[in-house]
Each structure stands twice: as C-alpha cells, then as structure tokens.
C-alpha cells in the first residue's frame, strides 16, 4: 500500500512532533543529573561513557575527580539498591557514611591519604563518631572496625566494596567472605586495560596510564589533583579471573560496566566456566615497539617481544594502514610509502560540516614505531602468502602427476576426501616477531580460575607457622586450612612409620605428636617446620591403630620407657603436630620397644581430645534424642549418617572425611531407598553408614524433602548419629535442618554439630520460644547523641520531651521480626503492657484491641515502666526509642528490617548517628495477609516467605480506585482525599487498597524499595495500582511482571474432606420455582400493600423525656449529623427509624430507657411456686470445663484474646464500668416508621471480667433449664424449626394463639425480678459472695456512653452475661403467674417475646397485683395465628418464615459504601432462601404470609423473587440522602 500521500500531512507531522517532544521530556525528566563543573573534554568523555543514558548537566559543585565521581555515584546507586541497607561495607568513604545505612564497616588503620580523608570528614552524625573513634585508636566497635576486610569476622550475608579492594586478590577476597559468612558481595573496581601491558606510558582521551615494575598510575583528563595508584598484579588478577576454587569457592561475574569501571558480583559458590571479554568496545590497538627500550644487542633477542614498549593506536588508523599495505603491489611496497600514507590518514579533514577523517596526532617516535610494525607485519604476511602459494602449486603438480592405480590406492587409504590447508611448513612462537606485533583487547577472552588464599599459603609463604583460615573440622563451611599428605621424616627421636600422617594446628597447646585422633591430612610446610623445631624434652606419642579391616600387619605396640616425670611443654603459639597411622601399603613396621615413645596419658598433663561417649551435650529432646558437640566420625552409635551427594561420589567436607577415614566403603553399596533428593543407601560397613543425599538449597529450598530424608534415616534399627544435612555447601538454614531432624528423631539418636555451630544451635534453635534476650548497650557517646536529639526536637514536640535526659544503660530486649502479615502484633500478649507505635493510625488500631498505645514522643516523656511493646521498631527514630525504654524492665520489639526505616524529616542525621544495631531474636516467614502474587514478587527481599492466603492474583493495573488509597508523598495525599501515605499505612491491614504512584515520588521509590514493599503488602484481597508516570516500573511493579507471576503460580487443589460429604437435603413437593424478581418492583408493591410512603426524613429526634431517677452526665456539645446518606434497596423503609449518630438521640435513649422511676412494691412476692410449674429439680450444680471452653471459643470467634479480663477490683473502672452503645432500631413495623415518638435502642456491655466470672455459671444453669423443660416448651433458639413446625402442625383443632410482647421490658425490672434471680443462683449452688456481687452490680450501676454517662439503680441491661436467660425466665414466670392456659400444646419463650398455643386463656386474680406493683406493660392478644421471633404460627398448618418481615428489615439497612456490605446482603438472602427451600415450604410460606398480613399472594411471590434476586447479587440499590429533624431542645 502506498502511503506517500500521507507523508506531508500536517496531522502526521504534528503527531510526530508531539511524540518526539513527549519522549524528550520523559528522557530529561528521568535523566541522571551531573552536578560538577566540567571542561569540554570531560563533558565529551562523560557523554561517551554513559552512551545510551540521558544526562542532564546542572553544574554547581567543584570536584577534584569529576568524571570518576559521577561514574562512582552511578555504580554506587546500583550496588546499594541491589545489596540493600543491611549490608557490610568495605572501606567506606567518610562522606557516604551519613547518607547510607550499613550494618558494619571495615576500615584499615588510617595512614597517608586515608588520614587526610578522616581529617576533613563531616563533623556530624555517625561519620563524626567513627572519625573520633578511629583517630583515638579504637580497633573494633559494633558499627565499624579497623582490622581490614581480611581480618574482620563480622557476620553478614551481603557486602559491598566501592573501589576499596584494589589491594586484595580475588583469592584473598574469597577467604575473607568465608570468614564473614558472606554469600554475596558487590565489588566496584577500576580495571583499565593498560594494566595488562608492560611498563611504560600509555595515553587515551580518557586518562593517562603509567606502568612501573609493580604499580599502575592512572590520571584522568583535566583532573586537578593526583591520580590513582594500584598494584599491577592485583589488577591483572581481577581482569583475568572469573572464579576461585578450593575450600572457599567463589564465582565472579561482571554485571555492569561504565568504561573501565566494573561492578563484579562475587558469589560464594562453586565456579563454572565463564569466558568473557572485558573490553568489547575498545577502539584502541596497542602496537609493539620492536626496538625496545634498553634491550640487549640485536633485534631478535629472546625477550625483545616480551618487555618491549607498546603504543596505543586508534583501531580505524591501524585497520586502514594494514589494508593499504596488504593490497599494495609488490613493486610498490616499501616502508616510506607506508609512512607517507600513515601521515596522511593522521591528518584531520573536514568538508563543510562533515568530518571526513577524524585524524590522529602521534609523536615522532610513535609514528615511526607504528610504521615499522606495520611494515614488518605486512612483510610477514606476504612471505607466508608466498610460501603458501609455492607449496600449494607444488602440491597441485604432485597430485596431477599421479598415475591411475596410485590414485585408486590413495582414494581407499585416505579417510578424508575433502582437502584442507597444510600449514605444517611454518610454526609461530610467542617470542617471535612473527607471532604478532599488536595487542587487541577487543578480542581478548579471559576465564582464569585461581585457588583461594588459604589453599596456597604453604606455597607462597613456606616459613609461616600456620594459616589464617582455621575453623572447625570436618564440615569446613567457614574456611579450613588445606590439608595435604606429608610423611614424617627424620628429625625427631620417634620411630614413626612412613605411612603415618600428621596434622598441624598453629593454635594448639597439645602434644607435639598425638596419634589418638582420627586420620587427617596436613600442611606440608607447617609439618616440616614443626618437625625441625626440636622440643626441650622428647615428645610423647600415643599411637592408635586405624588400619583398614583385614590389614595383616600387627598393631603398633608402644612400650613405655623410663622418662622424666616433668616434660617441658612446647611454647604456646608454636605448631603442634598430631599424627595418625595411615593406610598406605608400604613402610617398615614400628618395633615393639621404642625408647622415644611414651604413652601420653601417663606422662603429660596436656588436654586430650574428647573421647567417644564423652562429647558435650547441648540438649536432650523430649523424645530422648540428644544434640551433642563433637566429631561425627568418633561418635559411638550404631549408624553414622554421611551427607552424600546424588551420585554418591567422594566429595568435599564431611563426605570427603568419610572417604578418607574409610575408603573401603566406596563404591557405595547396600539397601537402597529412593527419594527425590537422591537414593538413600544403608551400607553395613564396618562401620554402618547411611549415605543420605539432602536437597540442594542453592537450587531451590525444599524443607519437605529435608524432612523426608531424616524420616528415612531414622527408620534404621539402632541409634543413628546425624549431622545437619544440607547445612554445609548446600546452604540449607541450620534451623530448618534441625527441625527436620527433631521431627523424626527417636530415643538414643544423636545430632552431632561442630563447635562453631554450637552457640548458633543453642541460641536460635534449641531456645526457640524462649529466645535469649539481646542487649542494647547505650554508652556515653550514644547517650549524648540521644540527649542532643531530644534537646533539638522541633516544635511542637519539643514541649513533650523537654527535660528528658538519658544516661548510659543496658536494655535487654526481644525482637520478633517477620514478613508482612506474619502476625507479629496480633500474637504478642499486650495485657499490662504499654505499646509504643510510630504513628497515630497504628496507635488507634492497638487501642481498638484494648491495649494502651502511645506515640514515641509521649512514651519518651512518660518513660513507661514494666513491660513495653514497641511496634514497628525500625520505623521509630532511635533517639526517641532509647528515651522511651530508659525505665522499661521487659521490652518486646516487633518489626521488619526490610520495611520503611526511621526517616530523618528534619535533616539532623540522628537516624544514622544513633545506630542501635537491633538484631532479631526470631524470624517469622509465614504471612497471613499477603496473596500469592505479592509473596512471589517479594521473594528477592524475603527468600523464604510463604502465605496462608487463598488469593492467587491480587495486584491489578485496571486504573480503578478501590478500598483504601495509599500514596507516597504528602503532596499526593492532599491531591487524593481520603488517602494515607505509606508511612501512615505501615503496620495496618486492609481488604482492598489502591496504590497511587505520582511523579514526585520517583526519587523516593528509586532510592528506597522499602516504601514499595509497604505499599504492596497492606491488602488481603485486591490491590489496584495507578502508575501513570511509570514510577513503579523501575522496580519491576508492572502488569507484565504480575501476569508472569500468575502463570507460574500453581493453583492448589482443594483438600479432601475428612468425612463423607452429605448432599443437600432433597426438597419435598411444594416448590413453585419462582424466578428472581426486580427488587425495585418488590419495593413499590410492598409500600403500596403496607401503606408506607417514600421517606422525606432520615429520622426524628423527639423531645427528650424527663429524668425521673439517677444522675446524668452530659457533654458540652449536643451535636450530630444533620443528614444521613445510605445505599438502600428502596427509598421506602418499613422499620422504625432513629438517629444513632446524634448526641441528643443517645441522651434520649439513656433517659427514656434507664432514667424513668422504677416501681418498687411494698410487699414481697414468692414466685418459686410459679417457677415450679415449668422448672423442676432445681439443685446445686457446678460449671464444668466445657462451659469455660465454650466461653473461650465465643471470645475467640469475636476476635478477643482475653486481655480485657483483669483482677476483680470494684474500684477499678475496667472491672465495674458498663458501656452503652446506641444502635439502629431495625424493628419491623406496620405503623409510621419515622414519626413513632419513641426513643432509640442501645446495647449495654458489661465488663469482660464480670462476663468471665458469671458466664460459665449462667451457661450451666441454662443447660439445666432446657434439659428439664416439660414437653411442648421451646426456649430461646435451642430448638430446630422442624420440631416446632411438627408441634404446631399437630396442635388440636380449635386451638388459639396467645402472643405477648412486653413494652419497656428492661426498664421495668426491679427488686422482685432481681431477688428471684439471686434466689435461683443460691439454689443452684453459686457462692454467696458471687450472688451478693451480682446483686450489688445490678442494684447500683454507672452506664457510660462515648460522651455521656448515667448513674442509676435497678433496671436490666441487655449486655449482661445472663440477659437472654434471666429475661426469658422472668417472662415465663410473669406469664404463668398472670395467666392460666387451658390445654397448652406449644409454649415458646425468648426474651420478652412469647407465644402459647392453647385452647383458651384467662387471667389469674393474683397476677393483677404483680403487674400493677412492678409497672409491667404487657401487649397481649389472642387469635387464630400469631408471630414469634421472625416466624408465623398457624396451628394445624405449621410454622413458616415471615417473608414480609425479612424483606422489610432489609429495606432499612445501609448496604454501602464498600463491597463487603453488599456481600453481607447476598449471604443473608442466600441463607434465608436456603432455609425456606430446603424444608420444602415455599408454597406454604407464601400462602400463610399473604393470609397473615391480608395481602395478595402475587405480591408475596414478587417479594420472594426479590429475595432470590438479592441472593444472586442482582439487586438494585439506590442512594438516599435525607435530613434529620431535631425536635429536642438543646438548652
């Protein structure tokens, strides 16, 4: 298709210009800002170095090394983001200490240039503290050391080194990483290619390099100060090395480079072939000067091509020169022509604005050397070409001159039929000029592998007495000396056989030679040095037979000679040799009587190694298994476990020790049991060994596989001694390996750990659940810094901490860390503790759970004593945290080091200056909040995170706004009403969230991944991401990323049910199969049938009633909301309405229900005879543990943890206060729902202490009542609808329904009802003090609302622990005392509601006085049918659900504003519909409801269809905004 006609379209041009402008704006907005002043050459160099990246120059700084520092800052940003904040930094520059966080910093003693840097270092924050400590000679501290990276042993998994390892070789770095137990290290190095050249001076447009015999000096272009000096050999090692092998393997990978500045990722793992080209874009060729400076006489001396000087030549110049010389005619080829052509192409040529030739400006000597090198190279190529052609022609002549039969014979004898090139006539040597006169680093490939430093110490320093890398044997994960075979020779008076082996330990104080230890291999030079050093007294030997089974030689027998009783021990620090008889085949036997051999135990007092069965026991598990410290190969057990590999080949570590001790066990054979990690082989030996390969955690963590391996191992008959399988080179956590072993360990089984792991096992594994508290040491310097922070606290917080001072102290704490949503705060017991939170939002959440929560400034001022809980400890400023804990006795901290740390809002740098170094005492890795996709995304930050959530995909990029809005900056918070920042959201949980990333948060998100972690881990179900500017794309939060995560997630299958599934009950005949109906149609029909009009008012506050008794406490302001907004099914409701949010409505309810005078009769009523009519066999009972368990289950179901239950003290308000809450009426009515003139309803909650005291008793009494009721009685809800339906269906014909509903039932109860309750409690055996306490609390009480209070007496409160029980009992007592029922068949009682199906009913004469004296208000009626507790009673027809009442109550509810309320509506309708349908009473229900209310059957069918529509989530909701009419007088 031809689109040329659109090329000149204005719209197309405009669109292209707009797109280009947008791209330019985006590039400039995201560009790297370059702040130093630069020369023109430096600017060009930076643009070329950062090719592909946008730079924006905003000069404002004067730097000595501007180009290098810009490169340094770029690589530093990448490295710190990759390493995270809790890393170890090697050789940190003083200016970076206050800006960046690190767990530890390693320095060398400041000398020379370092001394200058520390003298001019910043005089504030942590940098100033370290500067003063270094200059005062402090060697080691928590935050730093000046031992150097190679000598320090601070434990840290990740490290960084920014231009600080130019003096350490890769092998030494590998050993240092092992000492630090470091797995990953990011190393930034300056590695110029000129370091690979011989001594000389080399220049390019970026820098000048001067190579001396051992130094490499680099000075960058236009720099104003001295350059950099490095060791050439070290630079060459870093350039050529890609891996370190040996005991401390390391893999080196180049992950980023800017020019010759590299970021090397050093990983502690086995190296693999990784050939690489370090300078793939080098545009320089180095040409050799064949003359050579100061060489011997003669051009072709052997070293002329090795030590010659090289000149850098632009690649384009050299390629053009070689092309010209190669293509010249033989007659025209000469050196002068090459020199003339070289001079010509070295001249810059410009044609207009086009540079035709960039030019080159060489020196005279350089020009001559290049021309000569080119001439010699072309000469050599021409000679090779001539020789090749001549030999080829002779070969062709010979081939064509062959006879026929010779050709046939050659055809059958030659295997190859395709002729190749014959180059056998010439072979080049490396020292020849013909071997090449140029070095081209663009084509150089390096893949060198060296051995770690501790492996080569004996070869480099043969006189050294020991090795720096000495750790426990045999696991060797932290760096053990290389052990080699070295037979003992002459030099001692001992006659030891040649095949004995020695072991050297430089730190030992044992005998010079001791053969009582297992056979080990040793260092050659150290052994020789130890043997040459003669002790003052003959050494004593103890030779132990360690020969293989079946060795025919006699065991060595050492006869003890007469020696002096006091041998002189070797001086401490000298090497000590331990020798063990080897398994070699040759060598003379040791004679039975040797004068130089003396039993060690009889002569010396030196300590001996632990003997078999005498190892140190760390712990004994309940199963009888033991954890011991010792050598696995010497443990007395039936079976020894060898942590083998999958191929069962002799390896390193403990597996290698098994092979060296018992080589006859290989090849492995025996009983095999296959596992996914590899076959487990039971070998009979001797000794009996179980070869058990564990899972490789370097590939994938597999706790289940580890448990399976231990389970198979512990199936062996007899005791089993195991190591921590997979905890060595396979990198499994020691905790997981221990837990897997402990899960299946039996009585007598052993877990053998080495000495260096003992403390780790004791602290973090064996003491799980009772972690040893850590200590926070506050020295004088830290206390001064804390006091400085408190004194300079900004307004308005300075008034809170005014006068607070902190002295040096030590605080013991336990820090529970874990992944987001792991239940850190919900699992801690906050009873009696003060909770310190960083934000008010978090404090309110703690207060809602019943805790005493304060913010850090309040805590610093109050200094709480006793138990203190610190939530989100890492987010609290350290000086406030220290000040808050100065009086605390028991401190529990909660937090996550990967989330947002304490922020330095006011720029005082106190966060970095006061480094508390908090270390977790326990880690939790199971999240109960985060969905699966979020967990997978966070695996880089939390490698072992898992979740119990069932949500697979939760993060969406649809642009919708749902749930709580979370932003990153205060500006964005002001632009998005209702939103909160990530700092405020930290520690909170929401069902749905919306993350809004604005452009002003780019720097915050790019510099701190913790902010994104907090934002992504706040939701349970769904998270909508709105990222218009692509801010979150930089950290990988994209739709494509989460789509890939969703594809990777394995959807778990539902677990099989424990029992047999029961199908839903089959419905009986009577189903109408009515389809769902429109809810708005049902609402209109219901309004017409009942006669209710659409609402014009949300509620009416009637005039307040008169306070007849009690004392009322009123707030200063009686305000409330003037309008109500609800999302409802209709604008017409059928429930009595009130205004629960109005303060006047609350006071009206308090006074109307509990402020009226209570009538107290002058006569006493004995109602026990009345109770005997329905309650028989009242006698003493005791609540069992079942009632207490039911109480605990009820508390847990409501989210309570029992922390609100306190000691019984009536003077304590928490123990005696009754709390009042106003609630919606939601009472279905056929009268006017608004102008009803009645007060609202409320809930009175008793304190949890009294509920826990009386609750189990009342529950036991209730069970006794229900169990003893006569036939036909139905109590509360403790029956099934089917039983009630059957009883009503079987009622005799002609029976009537008597129903009664008390008015003001609670407020009319007085001393008569209370005395009755107390009398029943006494007869059931309740202690007298409890009865008296109940009578006291019920008689005189204080009802406390949020802002109001009422002090009164008598009455009944709905929140009492026995509300339903005693209200129902009082209801039954009054009805049986006032009325007499003839032939009752069904009697239902629940609270103040009651229904009796009987033949007739008449009033008792004695009941009139009870009603009058107690002021009872009874609303009774008798008819052919009645209503009871949302049920309609029709004698002879049965019991059906009240459809119209259910629909009317739904119209009053507010089903907004979130999706959760709509789901509640759907679930409620589903339950109601299922309740009707499963009983097969759909037709009966519709008919009886229509008959009860006197409406059309069709209308009830539409209501039934509307309920079905709501159950199917097909309802229609309307928003009603209505005013509240206030008729009360506020004065």
Swiss-Prot record:
Residues 1295-1406 form the RdRp catalytic domain. It comes from the Viruses. Residues 622-786 are annotated as: X-domain. ORF1 polyprotein does not seem to be processed into distinct enzymatic domains by a viral protease belonging to ORF1, but could be processed by a host serine protease like thrombin. Its main location: host cell. GO terms for cellular component: host cell perinuclear region of cytoplasm. One of its GO terms (biological process) is proteolysis. InterPro entries: (+)RNA_virus_helicase_core_dom, Alphavirus-like_MT_dom, DNA/RNA_pol_sf, Hepatitis-E_hinge, Hepeviridae_RdRp, Macro_dom, Macro_dom-like, Macro_X_NSP3-like. Residues 240-434 are annotated as: Y-domain. Residues 60-239 are annotated as: Methyltransferase. ATP binds at residues 818-825. Residues 803-1046 are annotated as: NTPase/helicase. Residues 56-239 form the Alphavirus-like MT domain. It is found in: Host cytoplasm; Host cytoplasm, Host perinuclear region. Transmembrane segments: none annotated. It catalyses: RNA(n) + a ribonucleoside 5'-triphosphate = RNA(n+1) + diphosphate; GTP + S-adenosyl-L-methionine = N(7)-methyl-GTP + S-adenosyl-L-homocysteine. Residues 435-621 are annotated as: Putative protease. The keyword Cell membrane does not apply. Its cofactor is Mg(2+). Belongs to the hepevirus non-structural polyprotein family. This is Non-structural polyprotein pORF1. It comes from Avian hepatitis E virus (isolate Chicken/California/Meng). The lineage of its organism: Viruses, Riboviria, Orthornavirae, Kitrinoviricota, Alsuviricetes.
């Amino acid at each position: 298709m031809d689109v040329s006609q659109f090329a000149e379209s204005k719209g197309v041009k405009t669109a292209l210009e707009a797109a280009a402008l947008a791209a330019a704006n985006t590039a400039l907005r995201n560009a790297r800002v370059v702040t130093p002043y630069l020369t023109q050459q430096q600017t060009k160099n930076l643009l070329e170095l950062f090719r592909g990246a946008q730079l924006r120059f905003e000069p404002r700084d004067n730097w000595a090394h501007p180009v290098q520092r810009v490169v340094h800052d770029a690589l530093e940003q990448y490295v710190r983001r990759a390493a995270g904040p809790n890393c170890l930094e090697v050789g940190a520059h003083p200016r970076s200490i206050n800006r960046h966080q690190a767990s530890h910093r390693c320095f060398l003693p400041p000398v020379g240039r370092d001394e200058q840097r520390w003298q001019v270092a910043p005089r504030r924050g942590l940098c100033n503290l370290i500067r003063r400590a270094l200059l005062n000679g402090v060697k080691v501290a928590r935050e730093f050391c000046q031992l150097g990276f190679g000598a320090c042993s601070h434990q840290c998994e990740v490290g960084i080194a920014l231009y600080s390892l130019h003096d350490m070789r890769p092998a030494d770095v590998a050993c240092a990483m092992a000492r630090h137990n470091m797995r990953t290290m990011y190393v930034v190095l300056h590695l110029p290619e000129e370091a690979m050249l011989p001594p000389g001076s080399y220049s390019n447009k970026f820098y000048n390099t001067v190579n001396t015999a051992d130094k490499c000096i680099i000075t960058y272009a236009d720099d104003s100060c001295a350059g950099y000096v490095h060791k050439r050999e070290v630079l060459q090692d870093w350039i050529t090395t890609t891996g370190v092998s040996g005991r401390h393997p390391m893999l080196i990978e180049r992950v980023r480079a800017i020019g010759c500045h590299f970021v090397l990722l050093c990983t502690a793992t086995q190296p693999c072939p990784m050939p690489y080209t370090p300078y793939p874009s080098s545009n320089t060729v180095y040409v050799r000067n064949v003359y050579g400076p100061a060489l011997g006489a003669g051009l072709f001396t052997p070293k002329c091509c090795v030590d010659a000087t090289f000149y850098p030549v632009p690649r384009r110049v050299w390629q053009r020169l070689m092309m010209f010389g190669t293509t010249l005619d033989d007659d025209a080829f000469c050196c002068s022509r090459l020199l003339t052509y070289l001079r010509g192409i070295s001249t810059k040529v410009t044609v207009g604005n086009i540079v035709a030739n960039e030019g080159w400006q060489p020196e005279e000597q350089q020009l001559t050397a290049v021309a000569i090198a080119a001439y010699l190279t072309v000469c050599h190529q021409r000679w090779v070409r001539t020789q090749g052609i001549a030999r080829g022609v002779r070969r062709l002549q010979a081939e064509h001159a062959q006879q026929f039969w010779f050709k046939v014979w050659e055809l059958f004898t030659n295997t190859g039929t395709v002729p190749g090139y014959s180059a056998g006539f010439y072979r080049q040597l490396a020292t020849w000029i013909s071997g090449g006169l140029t070095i081209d680093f663009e084509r150089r490939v390096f893949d060198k592998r060296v051995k770690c430093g501790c492996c080569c110490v004996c070869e480099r320093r043969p006189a050294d007495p020991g090795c720096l890398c000495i750790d426990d044997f045999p696991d060797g994960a932290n760096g053990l000396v290389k052990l080699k075979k070295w037979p003992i020779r002459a030099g001692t008076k001992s006659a030891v056989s040649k095949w004995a082996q020695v072991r050297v330990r430089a730190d030992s104080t044992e005998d010079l030679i001791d053969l009582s230890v297992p056979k080990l291999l040793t260092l050659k030079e150290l052994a020789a040095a130890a043997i040459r050093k003669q002790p003052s007294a003959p050494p004593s030997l103890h030779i132990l037979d360690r020969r293989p089974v079946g060795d025919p030689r006699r065991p060595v027998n050492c006869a003890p000679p007469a020696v002096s009783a006091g041998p002189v021990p070797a001086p401490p620090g000298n090497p000590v040799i331990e020798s063990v008889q080897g398994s070699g085949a040759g060598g003379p036997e040791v004679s039975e009587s040797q004068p130089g051999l003396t039993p060690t135990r009889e002569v010396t007092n030196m300590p001996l190694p632990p003997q078999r069965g005498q190892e140190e026991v760390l712990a004994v598990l309940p199963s009888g298994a033991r954890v011991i410290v010792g050598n696995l190969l010497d443990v007395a057990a039936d079976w020894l476990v060898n942590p083998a590999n999958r191929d069962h080949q002799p390896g390193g570590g403990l597996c290698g020790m098994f092979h060296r001790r018992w080589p006859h066990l290989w090849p492995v054979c025996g009983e095999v049991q296959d596992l996914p990690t590899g076959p487990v082989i039971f070998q009979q030996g001797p000794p009996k060994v179980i070869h058990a390969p564990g899972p490789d955690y370097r590939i994938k963590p597999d706790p289940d596989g580890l448990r399976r391996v231990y389970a198979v191992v512990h199936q062996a008959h007899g005791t089993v001694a195991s190591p921590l399988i997979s905890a060595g080179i396979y990198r499994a956590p020691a905790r997981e390996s221990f837990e897997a072993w402990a899960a299946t360990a039996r009585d007598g089984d052993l877990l053998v750990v080495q000495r260096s792991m003992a403390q780790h096992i004791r602290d973090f594994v064996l003491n799980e659940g009772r972690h040893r508290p850590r200590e926070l040491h506050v020295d004088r310097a830290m206390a001064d810094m804390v006091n400085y922070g408190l004194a300079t606290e900004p307004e308005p917080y300075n008034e809170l901490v005014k006068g607070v001072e902190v002295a040096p102290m030590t605080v013991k704490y336990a820090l529970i860390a874990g992944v987001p949503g792991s239940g850190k705060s919900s699992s801690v017991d906050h009873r009696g503790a003060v909770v310190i939170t960083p934000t008010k939002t978090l404090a309110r959440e703690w207060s809602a759970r019943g805790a005493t929560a304060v913010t850090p400034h309040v805590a610093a001022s109050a200094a709480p004593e006793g138990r203190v809980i610190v939530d989100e400890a890492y987010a609290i400023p350290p000086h406030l945290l220290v000040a808050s804990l100065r009086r605390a006795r028991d401190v529990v901290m909660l937090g996550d080091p990967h989330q947002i740390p304490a922020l330095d809002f006011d720029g005082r740098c106190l966060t970095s200056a006061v480094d508390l170094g908090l270390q977790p005492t326990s880690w939790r890795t199971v999240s109960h909040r985060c969905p699966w996709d979020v967990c997978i995304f966070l695996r880089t930050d939390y490698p072992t995170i898992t979740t119990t959530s069932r949500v697979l995909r939760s993060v969406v990029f649809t642009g919708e706004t749902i749930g709580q809005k979370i932003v990153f900056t205060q500006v964005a918070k002001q632009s998005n009403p209702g939103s909160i920042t990530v700092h405020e959201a930290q520690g909170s949980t929401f069902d749905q969230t919306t993350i809004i990333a604005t452009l002003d948060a780019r720097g915050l998100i790019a510099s701190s991944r913790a902010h994104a972690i907090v934002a992504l881990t706040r939701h349970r179900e769904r998270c909508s991401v709105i990222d218009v500017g692509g801010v979150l794309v930089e950290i990988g939060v994209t739709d494509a990323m989460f789509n890939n995560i969703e594809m990777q997630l394995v959807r778990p299958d539902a677990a099989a049910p424990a029992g047999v599934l029961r199908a839903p009950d089959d419905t009986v005949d009577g189903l109408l199969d009515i389809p769902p109906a429109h809810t708005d149609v049902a609402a209109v029909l219901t309004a017409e049938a009942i006669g209710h009009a659409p609402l014009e008012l949300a509620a009416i506050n009637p005039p307040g009633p008169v306070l007849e008794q009690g004392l009322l406490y009123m707030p200063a302001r009686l305000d409330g909301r003037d309008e109500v907004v609800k999302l409802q099914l209709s604008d017409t409701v059928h429930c009595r309405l009130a205004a629960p949010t109005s303060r006047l409505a609350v006071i009206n309810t308090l006074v109307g229900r509990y402020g009226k005078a209570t009538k107290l009769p002058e006569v006493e009523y004995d109602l026990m005879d009345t109770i005997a009519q329905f309650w028989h066999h009242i006698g003493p009972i005791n609540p069992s543990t079942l009632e207490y368990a039911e109480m605990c289950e009820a508390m847990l179901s409501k989210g309570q943890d029992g922390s609100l239950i306190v000691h019984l003290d009536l003077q304590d308000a928490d123990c005696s206060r009754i709390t009042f809450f106003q609630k919606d009426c939601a009472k279905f009515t056929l009268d006017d729902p608004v102008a009803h003139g009645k007060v609202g309803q409320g809930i009175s909650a008793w304190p949890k202490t009294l509920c826990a005291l009386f609750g189990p008793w009342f529950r036991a009494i209730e069970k006794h009542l229900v169990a003893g009721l006569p036939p036909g009685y139905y109590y509360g809800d403790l029956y099934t609808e089917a039983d009630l339906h059957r009883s009503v269906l079987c009622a005799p014909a002609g029976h009537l329904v008597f129903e009664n509903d008390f008015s003001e039932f609670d407020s009319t109860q007085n001393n008569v009802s209370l005395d009755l309750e107390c009398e029943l409690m006494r007869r059931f055996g309740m202690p007298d003090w409890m009865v008296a306490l109940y009578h006291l609390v019920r008689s005189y009480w204080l009802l406390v609302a949020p802002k109001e209070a009422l002090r009164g007496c008598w009455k009944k409160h709905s929140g009492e622990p026995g509300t339903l029980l005693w209200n129902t009992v009082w209801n039954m007592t009054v009805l049986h005392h006032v009325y007499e029922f003839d032939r009752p068949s069904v009697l239902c009682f629940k609270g103040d509601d009651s229904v009796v199906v009987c033949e007739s009913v008449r009033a008792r004469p004695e009941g009139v006085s009870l009603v009058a004296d107690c002021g009872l208000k009874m609303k009774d009626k008798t008819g052919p049918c009645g209503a009871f507790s949302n049920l309609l009673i029709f004698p002879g027809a049965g019991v059906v659900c009240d459809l119209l009442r259910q629909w009317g109550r739904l119209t009053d509810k507010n089903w907004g504003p979130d999706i959760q309320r709509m789901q509640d509506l759907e679930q409620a309708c589903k339950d109601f519909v299922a309740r009707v349908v499963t009983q097969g009473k759909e037709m009966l229900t519709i008919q009886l409801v229509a008959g009860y209310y006197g409406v059309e059957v069709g209308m009830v069918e539409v209501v039934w269809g509307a309920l079905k529509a709501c159950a199917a989530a097909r309802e229609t909701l309307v928003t009603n905004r209505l005013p509240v009419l206030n008729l009360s007088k506020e004065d």
